């Protein structure tokens, strides 16, 4: 099913590419767009994961600089029977995470610094189990290719606005109509991405993730915290084609389970996980248990100890005052964009 969905998606994206090329340069432009689309498809297959990780300045971590987080991913990977993915952290205050890679053998999972600061180890385990479920289902191939191609189509639409409309009436001129139509392609391509990546994959990943970590309430608690954080993600605002890759939509203003939303409504996902917890009897025998650091020693992510309070989801320990591994900041990537009034 994922292979067929990916093939259909690539065909749609290629057709859109060719259509914009025709509006810009007629038949010649269409053929050039076809060649570019073919090259883009191949490039996306091999390199889109690196492009997405680069867009968020994600940095790879290992057992030396992020021991607890890395061990959580390692333990969950063993539970799932998957190859060990590369593990990344990206500097962003919004609690969120995503997976990428063309197959389980070439996969990567990434968590934001905000996620590691806001969630308990059990909740982090629930989130990363969800991302590993995407890897297992090979959703990551579809997600990474669509993110790259949708962004490329948006750029081609902008190109049409500035350089289109110069063909003559014999097939070499479309006036201003062509560029105007091309300008519509960018949002339409984003809509196609949202439709092509079915929201049902999130429910499936939630369910499989709960099976991997062994406790659906860990993920339910994490989703509630992430949704309630209300932290902007300006990196995602600048790269909206990547929004569907995250565990919760990083963009503002999309809270309803509408036809074209990138994610199901969070409350619906939490309700499904609560029902699954009852079905599973709360916990499974093979539940994964993150290894907490000793209270007197450094905290799970690197420095301070946890505040020990139980929350209503059955997750031990509330949000902690721990710090996260230092991954190095590259400028102010998540600063609000500067406009003419500021």
From Swiss-Prot:
Chain residue ranges for the region called Disordered: 290-342
This protein's record includes keyword Metal-binding: yes
Transmembrane segments: 6-26, 28-48, 145-165, 173-193
Pfam family, one: Peptidase_M48
InterPro entries: HtpX_protease, Pept_M48_protease_HtpX, Peptidase_M48
Binding positions (Zn(2+)): 130, 134, 202
UniProt cofactor note: Binds 1 zinc ion per subunit.
Catalytic residues, chain numbering: 131
Domain of life: Bacteria
Cofactor: Zn(2+)
UniProt KW keywords: Cell inner membrane, Cell membrane, Hydrolase, Membrane, Metal-binding, Metalloprotease, Protease, Transmembrane, Transmembrane helix, Zinc
GO cellular component, as recorded: plasma membrane
The protein's enzyme class: hydrolase
GO molecular function, one term: zinc ion binding
Gene Ontology biological-process annotations: proteolysis
Predominant location: membrane
Keyword Ligase: no
Family classification: Belongs to the peptidase M48B family.
Protein name per Swiss-Prot or TrEMBL: Protease HtpX homolog
Organism placement in taxonomy: Bacteria, Pseudomonadati, Pseudomonadota, Alphaproteobacteria, Hyphomicrobiales
